[in-house]
Amino acid sequence: MSKGPAVGIDLGTTYSCVGVFQHGKVEIIANDQGNRTTPSYVAFTDTERLIGDAAKNQVAMNPTNTVFDAKRLIGRRFDDAVVQSDMKHWPFMVVNDAGRPKVQVEYKGETKSFYPEEVSSMVLTKMKEIAEAYLGKTVTNAVVTVPAYFNDSQRQATKDAGTIAGLNVLRIINEPTAAAIAYGLDKKVGAERNVLIFDLGGGTFDVSILTIEDGIFEVKSTAGDTHLGGEDFDNRMVNHFIAEFKRKHKKDISENKRAVRRLRTACERAKRTLSSSTQASIEIDSLYEGIDFYTSITRARFEELNADLFRGTLDPVEKALRDAKLDKSQIHDIVLVGGSTRIPKIQKLLQDFFNGKELNKSINPDEAVAYGAAVQAAILSGDKSENVQDLLLLDVTPLSLGIETAGGVMTVLIKRNTTIPTKQTQTFTTYSDNQPGVLIQVYEGERAMTKDNNLLGKFELTGIPPAPRGVPQIEVTFDIDANGILNVSAVDKSTGKENKITITNDKGRLSKEDIERMVQEAEKYKAEDEKQRDKVSSKNSLESYAFNMKATVEDEKLQGKINDEDKQKILDKCNEIINWLDKNQTAEKEEFEHQQKELEKVCNPIITKLYQSAGGMPGGMPGGFPGGGAPPSGGASSGPTIEEVD
């Protein structure tokens, strides 16, 4: 295949989306199911690996081996409080591998474990394939988005996931920045505008404030709640109906995973309906112990169930405004991102908060981030079209960065929300007389003491000549590149001795070897998936051949045209094959092909004889001639294949 354009991928917690900039506009690409967003789900079964819709659709039957929310694990340590609390809610197992979390599943009868990067890489591979199927070209270059609050290690791990998926990640950019780009292209403005991005997705909520002036974006502040989103609204509805079921039928379905799962799916559908209608009905046959559950819910009741959650979305809005030192009257534009912003009540709360200001909903909220990422991909890969020429992108550091100084104090060199790339230098000195070296410990976080912040890495600068305290001058430089990767260096001014560290954050980092290995494994899994597809198609081909053959000889139009002995011979062989199929669903492709040859050996001579004696086929035979499904392995076209008879 020829080389395709660069794409933009929104790798979401619950859903992902891919877009491409071509013919002067962005196209959001639908998957093979016709959906423009794809669930970030990967499932493992005894026979295959499923990604996307196929994985999400079978979650009820296979909950422990269906992995989602990899984004909540990526770039984190196993003992991270977030990982520990999230684990309680996941049906799949998370295990500790030398301090790093891995998800453990049963796949093809074996226990397998995968790093979050590997799971995310499977979703990215799926997004890559969706784009390739649409473009008819290979896709390698991509811009991938992450939440604004992602730290260095999470960004780096996301980049690694791209590498494992065989992508060249041009840049990792913040989701609100991407949404702003999508929006910035739509409405070019001269004077400086303050834009608030309200992103309420499936599992997370982020508020960001940006200023846009002459095509230049600057992120002023970010706030949010990593655990608020559409799924929480679904849960409220699920609990409401579990209680209703208890009242009506005196039975508690909450312990029955499958019943709850079916109820949740129905609730998600009802929630979407309630964004456009004021009432939604739910009908689930045989939900629990044979009881059908037919009920309905009004929009008002849905809003009441979620009243505190909906109202709570305004707190991060206020915090973001405070951080950006802006009053709400100074916000020029409000941009909605994320499927949950379609909920009318949320739109109303937000609009009322901003004193009736119109909200920008022109870009489909599920697609805005991928849309902007696609534009950014076009810019970075050198698209020269008018539309993208005058766009500049400034991202920010999500958390303050600094070093520990005497007494465990956090001394900040780069404040949070600083536009990157950036470089800051500060001079430090020794704390005691004749101190031979200093330990530079790099932290990220907003607390005054380093013990409450997050240690990114440390290194020593030794060989400082003996001197009284306060005399040596040690210059510490923090340098962040456009991808948010941090370099910290320290130089002793008197000797010129230098030491430095690149924080690509080992607390969640994979080594080069790990990544290489995972790239290979990803290839292997892909090959296995291919093999599985071939196997299924040869099985289906054999099955349809056998059933068609049976139908053909049993057709009354053939009465008297085929002798009973021949007919019985074919029926016996067909039934034998059908029985064999029932017992050997998981046989190898070659076995199915062999069985098909055996069947053809019996059928073809009889059918040929029939054909000749009839002077052409009798008209209107059911299903035409057998050999439906994929052509048998003889490389023949469909229809009967003729072979030498032994």
Swiss-Prot record:
Cross-link (Glycyl lysine isopeptide (Lys-Gly) (interchain with G-Cter in SUMO2)): K512
Cellular compartments per GO CC: blood microparticle; clathrin-sculpted gamma-aminobutyric acid transport vesicle membrane; cytoplasm; cytosol; extracellular exosome; extracellular region; extracellular space; ficolin-1-rich granule lumen
Chief localisation class: cytoplasm
Modified residues (N6-acetyllysine): K108, K246, K319, K328, K512, K524, K589, K597, K601
An annotated GO BP: regulation of protein stability
Catalytically driven reaction(s): ATP + H2O = ADP + phosphate + H(+)
Enzyme Commission identifier(s): 3.6.4.10
Residues recorded as bearing N6,N6,N6-trimethyllysine in the entry: K561
Membrane-protein topology: Peripheral membrane protein
Residues modified to N6,N6-dimethyllysine: K561
Biased composition (Gly residues): 616-632
Record GO terms (molecular function): ATP binding; ATP hydrolysis activity; ATP-dependent protein disaggregase activity; ATP-dependent protein folding chaperone; C3HC4-type RING finger domain binding; cadherin binding; enzyme binding; G protein-coupled receptor binding
Pfam families linked: HSP70 (PF00012)
Covalent cross-link (Glycyl lysine isopeptide (Lys-Gly) (interchain with G-Cter in SUMO1)), residues: K512
Region (Nucleotide-binding domain (NBD)): 2-386
Localization: Cytoplasm; Melanosome; Nucleus, Nucleolus; Cell membrane
Binding site for ADP: T14, Y15, G202, E268, K271, S275, G339
NCBIfam families assigned to the protein according to its UniProt record, in alphabetical order: PRK00290.1 (NF001413)
Record's subunit section: Component of the chaperone-assisted selective autophagy (CASA) complex consisting of BAG3, HSPA8/HSC70, HSPB8 and STUB1/CHIP. Identified in a IGF2BP1-dependent mRNP granule complex containing untranslated mRNAs. Interacts with PACRG. Interacts with HSPH1/HSP105. Interacts with IRAK1BP1 and BAG1. Interacts with DNAJC7. Interacts with DNAJB12 (via J domain). Interacts with DNAJB14 (via J domain). Interacts (via C-terminus) with the E3 ligase CHIP forming a 210 kDa complex of one CHIP and two HSPA8 molecules.
Function of the molecule: Molecular chaperone implicated in a wide variety of cellular processes, including protection of the proteome from stress, folding and transport of newly synthesized polypeptides, chaperone-mediated autophagy, activation of proteolysis of misfolded proteins, formation and dissociation of protein complexes, and antigen presentation. Plays a pivotal role in the protein quality control system, ensuring the correct folding of proteins, the re-folding of misfolded proteins and controlling the targeting of proteins for subsequent degradation.
Family: Belongs to the heat shock protein 70 family.
Protein name stated in the entry: Heat shock cognate 71 kDa protein
Classification of source organism: Eukaryota, Metazoa, Chordata, Craniata, Vertebrata
Gene: HSPA8
